[in-house]
Amino acid sequence: MAVKTVVLGLDGADHDFIGAMIAEGELPNFRRLRSAGAAHEIENDPGQGNVQFWTGAAIGAGPGWHGHYFYLQFDPKTYDIVMDYDIGLPEVTPFWETLDKEGYRAAVVDWYEMPVKPLKNGVVIHRWFAHEPLTHTEFHPPEMAEVAARYAASDPIAEGFASQPREGAEALTEFFDRLLSRIDIKASFYADQIRETDWDLYVACFSEAHNAGHYYIQLEDETHALHDPQLADELRHPLRRCYRELDKGIGKVLDAAGPDANIFMVGGPSMGKFISANSALGEIARRVDLGWNAPRSGAETAKETYHSLIPQGLRRRLAPLARLVRRKVASSDYKHRRFFAVPHNDNAGAIRINMKGREKYGVVSRGAEYDAVVKEIAEGVSSFKNPETGRSIVGRVVDVAREFDGPHRDLLPDVFIEWDRTGTHGDFTHLASEKFGEVSLPRQTRTGDHGPTGYFWAPHSNLASPERPACVTDHILRAVRSAGPTSQQRL
């Protein structure tokens, strides 16, 4: 059997970290791929995280063309915060569905957070060994579940890192070893599938760099405020071990694909220190909207009490209660507000404006009033400073109406606020504004978070540099179509 094109997807992989290990003589398979063609860095869309990075790379479009920005989305009809799969997002067509309609045989395993549709000629597996176990695995066709079970009866980290406190070498090592075991399981599955079936396209994704970056980066980054050199030695530098295992897994896939296959790699978004004001943005937005001394509502007081009483490690188990609190705040309070914070990736905060004609109880008109509110938000949030640096916590304010186009732009928050992470060694703990007072932030479970860049490696040295994730799609489509007749035509 033969495969014409392979796309390796490395969720959360950091291009600079890979490059540094290659320069030290490690990661031979990464080096082999990078030197075989073109290697480009990709800048993510402004204020965006994993969802847009991977969705954009799959469908060839920016966030305004699909409206999907986070796994939790705001519903303007109810003011509720709901799971992305419950809100009825617009249908999108990733590159593998386009190829499937043209008669190509494709397999796609664990592409990050894409709506799942069965393929006529191929295989789709969604959330088999994903970054976080938010939903059950979907297998199309269903019999692929039995095939996958031969390699692992269940996800070795199915409960997720944050399901319980994990401190000390023993607890961190136990979870990390299970995380690494997933790489070999998936690599073996991919290699066997590639050898056993005639594929036009095989998309093989790994998410382990994502998990390792969120929870173990402080053991690799000596400038991190939480760096513990003794613990790093006890765990034998886990990030390096993760990338070495990924390199071995990639080697298995490359050997199975053979020398004639086109090999692409998409990775990112990058990883760095966790530095975010998202946990305080709800309170910051309230003060900017209503004033420093405005009394909290009963719903907001309940939310604050929940966060003060429930330890971070228990919140995943109590997620239904958290959603109830969130709904109470949204339905009771947000309809009376001009703007409010909504959940988003930690690299940037997100604020929704209560717009007339869009939100059920909208109060802000489009045009001059909207522009004035955006300016007020930008100035208000920017007035909060990080005491460690003396600078504003805001690196960039993204006005969605001006930055993004597309028919589904109204599904997005109206303002994204990228946090200024320069010169800071650890997460924000205390913020201060001369106008709006002081805000304290709780300690987060994660120690690492995503940066603004990813990368795209292609087997063609004359490849034009892709500027955004959306530019990846055309290159892959062109490679598959130019590789010859479809598997169906060859039959």
What name fits each language-model region?
Residues 22, 52-62, 279:
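Glycine-rich loop at the start of a catalytic domain that most often binds anionic cofactors/ligands
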Residues 180-192, 392-402:
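A Trp-anchored, charged/polar loop motif used as the substrate-binding/catalytic surface
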Residues 95, 182, 186-193, 235, ...:
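Alpha-helical packing segments of well-folded alpha/beta enzyme cores
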Residues 3-5, 105-107, 182-218, 417:
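Active-site regions of oxyanion-processing enzymes, predominantly non-cytosolic
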Residues 196-241, 245, 277, 347-348, ...:
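Active-site His/acidic residue clusters
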Residues 418-466, 472-473:
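Low-complexity, glycine/alanine/valine/leucine- and proline-rich hydrophobic stretches
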Residues 10, 19, 24-25, 32-43, ...:
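Secreted, luminal/periplasmic, and some membrane-associated catalytic domains
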Residues 15, 171-176, 228-239, 361-364, ...:
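Glycine- and acidic
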